[in-house]
Amino acid sequence: MPFWVGGVVKSGLTMTTMEIFAWLLIGHAIADYPMQSEWVARAKQPGFTFDGEAIWPSVLACHAGIHAGAVKLATGSWLLAGLEFVAHAGIDYSRGRGLLSYNGDQAAHVGCKVLWAGWAGFA
């Protein structure tokens, strides 16, 4: 019986690049919507403070870490998880600074998933 190990079924079968991409999008949708509360969405914005302390860097890092975990599960790659962490934090930081619109933010995230799926699918 096959079992999952880091995004690849271990029974002689592997996922196609499109299947990896689909799992990456599912992970993104789950991490960016039901797993991101309204409080997290506000608290990860640059400049957010709580009781006089700037907590936004740690909240943004936690949010990016959840996304990195989803990438690790979908691809089995720690390298891609690390790249996702950096990219996701950078994209969300840019959005928080007003450099990206909502649609631009989501397009950048999906673009990263295309790159990760391509890398994982051909590695």
Enumerate the language-model features and the residues they cover.
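Interhelical loop and helix-boundary elements at the membrane-water interface
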Residues: 23-67, 85, 89-121
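Helix-coil boundary and interhelical linker segments in multi-pass alpha-helical membrane proteins
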Residues: 2-22, 68-80, 115-123
